[in-house]
Every structure is written in C-alpha cells, then in structure tokens.
Regions:
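Pyridoxal 5′-phosphate
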Residues: 1-173
C-alpha cells in the first residue's frame, strides 16, 4: 500500500504482520546456520557486515582485553581493532603461510590470560582460502573465548554449523 510500518512500535495489523515476517526470517536464519542454542531474538539485523563487526567488537571489548585475529583479516575487523588499540585493547595475528592457509599450530601459544575473543573471516576475499572453523572453535572452547566469524564470502554457500563450530557470533549479508 506504500505506507511505512513501524515494527515493534505500531499497534496496527500491518505492523504485526511485518513483525511476524521478521521473526520468521530470524528463525529461518537460525536454522540455516544451526544456531539451536538461541532463538530468533538472538538474530539481529544491521546495515552490513562492517557495522555488525563494529558493534560486536566495540560492545564486547574493554581496555586491557586481548584479541586473536588471522593475518588475513579484512579491514572491517582491523580498523575497529586499531581504533580500540588506542583504548588499551591489544591483538595478535595468527599467521598464515604463503598460500593463505592458517598456521593453526601457532594459535594456542598466542592465547594470553586476558584474551577475550578470536575473530576471523571464514574465507579470504583475496585468495579464497578458508579458515578451519572447526579447529578454531575448539581452541575458543578450550580457552573460553568468544568466537566471532565474518562469513561475507561463504554464508549461504558453504555450510556453517554455529553449534558444532562453537561460533558465538556470525556476521553475514
């Protein structure tokens, strides 16, 4: 009808209808990515992945926290981390070899007592290599770290099982 709907605030039928559609979309996404530990309310929509990652990083990290990233990270992760560095957040890069494959054996040694989270892309937008999410998720579980994954290149194409991979937050478009 061309009329704007104010979801979550309007008390009219069109607002309720759109709210139901949004909730069902959240549930479908939750099922697609095997996020069974939560409900659709744990699925949020933002303008894009960069905004999602900024909200996550700036919302979770505090001065004194340490973060692990891969040496392949996109600027959507690195720019907010560099900003947070000025506020006392530190980070280390898990190295990759010359083909872009993560050198997983070095990850455990980079974990510090103040390491709070590991954030990584699922697949490189430059060379296409995929990060071993299962193994990284195990490291996060072992060290009780948040695990944040940027799946810009893979969401909906490569299967992602958030529960099995121990992923706490998945950013995608």
């Amino acid at each position: 009808s061309g009329c704007a709907v104010n979801v979550g605030r309007g008390g009219y039928q069109a607002a309720y209808s759109v709210e139901e559609q949004i909730f069902e979309t959240r549930e479908q996404l939750r099922r697609l990515f095997h996020f069974t530990s939560g409900r659709g309310k744990n699925v949020i929509f933002t303008q894009n992945i960069t905004m999602s990652l900024n909200i996550l990083l700036k919302g979770i990290l505090k001065p004194g926290d340490h973060v692990l990233v891969t040496s392949m990270e996109h600027n959507a992760v690195m720019r907010p981390l560099v900003q947070l560095q000025r506020q006392g957040v530190t980070f280390d890069r898990i190295p990759c070899d010359h083909e872009g494959n993560l050198i997983l054996s070095e990850a455990d040694a980079l974990v510090k007592p103040n390491t709070r989270l590991l954030v990584c892309l699922h697949a490189s937008n430059v060379c296409g290599t995929r990060m071993p999410l299962d193994a990284l998720g195990e490291i996060c579980q072992r060290h009780q770290l948040y695990f944040v994954v940027d799946s810009a290149q893979t969401a909906g194409i490569v299967p992602i099982n958030m529960d099995k991979m121990h992923i706490d937050a998945l950013a995608f478009t």
